[in-house]
Amino acid sequence: MRRSVLRLIILCLGVLLALGAVGLARLAESPCSPLSRTPCVRVLFLGNSYTYVNDLPAVFRDLARAGGQNVETGMVANGGETLAQHAASSDSLGAIRGSSWQFVVLQEQSEIPALASAWRSQMFPAAEALVGSIRAVNATPILLETWAHRDGLPGDGLDYAAMQVAVDDSYEGLGQDLGVMVVPAGQAWAAVLRVDPAITLWQDDGSHPSLAGTYLAACVLYARLFHASPVGISDTGGLSSALARTLQTVAGQL
C-alpha cells in the first residue's frame, strides 16, 4: 500500500515538473469586470519561459488594475519557444484568431535577437508573419524587447553590455521596419543596474527574470501601453515598497 502511494506521489510530481518545463497556454484568465466604467483592455502574450516564469501576464494585469485600468490577459508560452514556432503553431494562431484581443505581445527567444544571422533568418520573417496575423483580426502587435543574459553570450564574444546593445538594435530595427511598438524591457534592466547594481533582476541561472525583473518588465509595458507613468501604483508585485518604487521610476522615465 505504501509503495503504491509513493509511486502515485512520484507520478504526480513528474507530471507537475513536466508541465512546468513545457510551459503554459492560458486564455481569458480573470476577465474584465463588467461593472467597471473603464473600457476593457484585452492583452494576449506569445512568448516562452521569459514570459511565463513569475507569470508576467498576471503581474502586468494586477499592476494595471491597481493603476485604474480594466485589463484581461491571456498567454501561450512554452519553454524555449521562438517566434518562428509561434508563427507555425495552431495554438498560437488559434489564440490570435479565437478571441477579441486588442493587443498581442510578442517575445522572442533570448539569444536570437543578439545574433545577426539568426535575427535575419528567423526573427524577422516570423515576426512579420505574426504581425500580419494579428493585424488581420484588427489587433495591435507589440514587441517585448528582452534583456541580455547576465554574462552575455561568451561563446559568441558578447558580454552583457554588448549582448544588450545587439538585442536593442534587433528589436528597434524590427519595430521600425514593421511599424510596431517596442516595449524596451531590456533597456530598463540596464537602466536599473546603473541606478543600483545590487538589485537582483536575474534568477541564479543569469537568464530568467527574478520577481523584480518580471515586475520591471510589467512596469515598462504599462508605461508604453497606457502612455502613463507607473510611479505611485500601489501594487508592488510582492516586492518591498522601496524596490517597487525604484523599478516604477525607471520604467516611467524611459
Where are these regions (language model features)?
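N-terminal Sec-pathway targeting helices
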Residues: 1-14
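N-terminal low-complexity, Pro/Thr/Ser-rich intrinsically disordered segments
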Residues: 29-42
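Conserved SGNH/GDSL esterase-like catalytic core that processes O-acyl groups on lipids
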Residues: 41-44, 50-129
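Membrane-interface motif at the C-terminal end of an N-terminal transmembrane signal
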Residues: 19-31
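Short alpha-helical patches at coil-to-helix transitions and adjacent helical residues
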Residues: 53, 211-218
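Conserved catalytic region of serine esterases and O-acyltransferases that act on ester linkages
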Residues: 201, 208, 218-254
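Alpha-helical cap/lid subdomain in secreted, periplasmic
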Residues: 93-211, 223
